[in-house]
Amino acid sequence: MYYKYDITYSNDVANEKEYLINLIDSPGHVDFSSEVTAALRVTDGALVVVDTVEGVSVQTETVLRQAMQEKIRPVLMVNKIDRSILELKLDGEAMYQSFLRVIDMANVVIATYVSEDMGEIQVDPSVGNVAFGSGKDQWAFTLAKFSRLYSTKFGIAIDKMMAKLWGDNYYDAAGKKWRTDGEAEDGKPLRRAFAQFIMDPICKLCQAIIDGNVEQYTKMLKILGLELSQ
């Protein structure tokens, strides 16, 4: 797979902008653990895909354990969020809590089996090693994508913006302040930044596509620098 790094919204100064990536699809079932081990021994990293509705399964734990044994650093893909939006019809806060449970469960497994010489390898959206998306519909994002969009608006560096978009961070528009207590200066409850600035636009985009509102979804896709395939 050829990948060219999108520097449109980035201030990164890394030397490499183009990559050739070889992906090995290994079985996740516990009965094929030897095949997973063989794949891990010829790779530089592991992309662990977890169903956000089903959560971390026995198979997921087995794969993470094997990655730790082979000293392979994992990254996490929280998959099937289309089900959360269209099937379960969860709001942004409920989806955040669902994603958080998956990430926390994965980190418990990692912490259980990691060796000290591997250093800090916990998966955390705010550092860029967790993606969210829909394999079925062929789209995904990391917090970095939205951080690049919002960093200019809020006058915050991209890495700091990523931290604002995860965890207990809320924006008080009236007071023009970021808060961590979920309550505005006037005592009114605030919406979590991840729900407000990421999931709300995604849910609105999905609904606009379903409703056939071409004008609305075309405008939203343009802001994201995306095109909708036929």
Model-derived segments and spans:
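Structural and coupling elements of P-loop NTPases
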Residues: 1-230
